[in-house]
A protein has these predicted regions:
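Short, acidic, Ser/Thr-enriched surface-loop or helix-capping motifs
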Residues: 303
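Acidic, carboxylate-rich catalytic segments that either coordinate divalent cations
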Residues: 311-312
């Protein structure tokens, strides 16, 4: 999708007597799902979804396909369901790998590992080969040891690993130290898809259909919520120990991605948790929910005469960058004691990056 269609996020730190006293999050992301999809056949809608979104394109296409099939009352065969889940997981793995091999190293003034990232991407067409390549890279590049062993580490063993291992992720975690996490948030976590009841999904779908503004500022049980790997991995013992000791901040989000990445070869081998679900809501209405690298993606469609009449998309970025959500709460706590403008802006950028928006963002400092 072009930049004009994607929009962007503007985070404004408003100073009162040289101290950040207010945080404003404004999104210029246009809600174009209705305009782009209305009047299309289900097949054309799925094709368009895969083309217009530059990030998570496979997940977006799958979401459109699944939502339209649900509206038509079509039940996909087991082979198609497995193929879709594998494509979503492969795309998710590549996004996580990009963070650890390219994005965060550049921010931390470390040397990026583009060669490993390209090797992983070259194997993406074959789930078996991708799983084998990812397992090898986890051992040689990401962790420095077998993923099965690394995943058993408690917090003390993890701290020893990040201090001693020569891998790029270990070096990145060294910068966190052993103190409190950066940008701690207490915002509720959106339950992972595997824990969402059909009635809860149906409620989200009906809210989106009834009010298009809900798609831009979604709420869970009456308030904002955070979604992503941290919500899916919150019960893992290592992540839970980190959060108990250091808080749920940028470091916890990064750790959740690494834990999820380390588990992905096993998931691709067949031990898959729910990453794609379909819901027929009656009256030619269908909903899909898909776990992407950034969090839960929801598509809702109402068909009339075999074509799209209403279409809604609730993307992870809208959850995490809600004007009163996880970002604002995290920044409020993180920069409360940071008087220098530069320190506050740097902190804000790091927290924003940890929440991983699917569009560009800018942090600005202004006076009240």
């Amino acid at each position: 999708m072009s930049a004009s269609l994607e929009g962007r996020l503007d985070i404004n730190l408003i100073l009162h007597a040289d101290v950040v006293g207010e945080i404003a999050v404004r999104s210029s992301r246009p809600r174009l799902a209705q305009k782009l999809m209305a009047g299309l056949t289900p097949l054309a809608a799925a094709e368009r979804a895969g083309l217009i979104f530059s990030l998570c394109g496979k997940a977006q296409r799958a979401a459109a396909e699944v939502a339209c099939e649900a509206a038509l009352g079509i039940q996909s065969g087991a082979e198609i369901e497995i193929m879709r889940a594998q494509q979503v997981l492969i795309e998710l793995a590549q996004e996580h790998a990009w963070h650890f091999l390219l994005h965060w190293p550049q921010r931390a003034a470390e040397t990026a590992d583009m060669a490993s990232l390209l090797a992983l991407r070259k194997s993406a067409a074959d789930p078996t080969q991708f799983s084998l390549k990812l397992e090898q890279l986890l051992n040689d590049v990401f962790l420095g040891e077998p993923a099965s062993r690394w995943l058993t580490h408690d917090l003390a063993a993890f701290d020893l690993w990040r201090k001693q291992a020569a891998t790029l992720p270990a070096k990145l975690f060294r910068t966190w130290g052993g103190g409190a996490d950066h940008g701690i948030s207490q915002a509720p976590l959106l339950p992972p898809l595997r824990q969402l009841a059909p009635s809860q999904c149906a409620e989200l779908a009906h809210l989106a259909l009834a009010n298009e503004d809900f798609c831009g500022q979604p709420e869970w049980t009456g308030g904002p919520a955070e979604t992503g790997a941290i919500a899916r991995q919150q019960q893992h013992s290592l992540l839970a120990a980190w959060i108990d000791a250091r808080g749920r901040g940028a470091g916890a989000r990064l750790l959740a991605r690494l834990i999820e990445l380390a588990n992905l070869p096993q998931q691709l081998a067949g031990n898959q948790v729910a990453v794609v679900k379909a819901f027929n809501l009656g009256e030619n209405i269908g909903m899909s929910a898909i776990e992407t690298s950034r969090g839960l993606l929801i598509h809702v469609v109402r068909l009339a005469g075999g074509r799209v009449a209403d279409y809604r998309i609730v993307a992870p970025t809208e959850w995490n960058f809600h004007p009163a959500g996880a970002l604002v709460e995290a920044l409020t706590q993180a920069i409360a004691d940071l008087a220098p403008c530069e320190a506050a802006a740097t902190c804000a950028e790091a927290v924003c990056q940890s929440l991983d928006p699917c569009v560009s963002f800018a942090v600005e400092v202004s006076h009240a």
